Amino acid sequence: MTALSRFPRFFVTSPSPCPYLPGRQERKIFTELSGQQAGELNDALSRIGFRRSQSVAYRPSCAGCTACVSVRVVTEGFQPNATQRKLLKRYGDLEVTACKPWATGEQYELLKRYLDSRHPGGGMAAMDESDYADMVEQSPVSSYVIEYREPSVNGERGRLVGACITDQQGDGLSMIYSYFVTDDEARPGMGNFIIMDHILRARAAGLPYVYLGYWVKGSARMAYKTRYRPIEVLGPTGWALLEDEDMVGAMPSAVAAALA
């Protein structure tokens, strides 16, 4: 077996405008996930801050910036606060199903409404149904679409009010992308509920973590991620509990050196 077949090859994207910090440029390092070891590689890379998108694992590698910090919730210690308990009770009627990674028109229509409401003009705004199918189905790892529906009536499935593309990893669940109704006053806080549902289900399955992707201090779009405690951040010496949000996260030095 050659070295190239044993170890993944990494590539770096060209700089592009940062979607989180105005005036900044982002750059990503990435590798392909393929073959029988794709799941094992994805698990290992997630532990050093990579995320999956279809058959690619990537992480920020921006010149002079380490603002994007990987975060994961420690499921065993999670205790919902009063507001979160009310939300869990409010949505106790929903029917939750872990579906195979097969895109449906109903899912796509919900995604489009979500994007039009929350992220108009964003990078996914022009996504068509074929693009969505690729997003869901081109997964070389253990992946699901977790659907959240209103109660069934007379044998008919209830309305789809939320969904999340989720990977099952060796040490937890990784929430790849969630979307939900945003224009129903009877369903506020749906995104928060989906995160808590993942935390509780992961804990029940004996999985220690729920990976939430990247957190950027000072970004309003990212602020919600630190509501779920205890939460760990990936810093220079590895994963550590986030106790002071003024702390500065950075890529572990060994990883930075290897990817330079």
UniProtKB/Swiss-Prot annotation:
Top-level EC class: transferase
Entry-linked SUPFAM superfamilies: Acyl-CoA N-acyltransferases (Nat)
Principal subcellular localisation of the protein: cytoplasm
A GO term from the CC aspect: cytoplasm
Keywords tagged on the record: Acyltransferase, Cytoplasm, Transferase
A single GO molecular function term of this UniProt record: arginyl-tRNA--protein transferase activity
Pfam families: ATE_C (PF04377), ATE_N (PF04376)
Reactions that this protein is recorded to catalyse: N-terminal L-glutamyl-[protein] + L-leucyl-tRNA(Leu) = N-terminal L-leucyl-L-glutamyl-[protein] + tRNA(Leu) + H(+); N-terminal L-aspartyl-[protein] + L-leucyl-tRNA(Leu) = N-terminal L-leucyl-L-aspartyl-[protein] + tRNA(Leu) + H(+)
Gene Ontology biological process terms from the UniProt entry: ubiquitin-dependent protein catabolic process via the N-end rule pathway
Localization terms from the record: Cytoplasm
EC number: 2.3.2.29
Segments passing through the bilayer: none
PANTHER family linked: ARGININE-TRNA-PROTEIN TRANSFERASE 1 (PTHR21367), ARGINYL-TRNA--PROTEIN TRANSFERASE 1 (PTHR21367:SF1)
Biological role: Functions in the N-end rule pathway of protein degradation where it conjugates Leu from its aminoacyl-tRNA to the N-termini of proteins containing an N-terminal aspartate or glutamate.
Stated family: Belongs to the R-transferase family. Bpt subfamily.
Name this protein carries in UniProt: Aspartate/glutamate leucyltransferase
Origin species: Sphingomonas elodea
Gene name for this UniProt entry: bpt
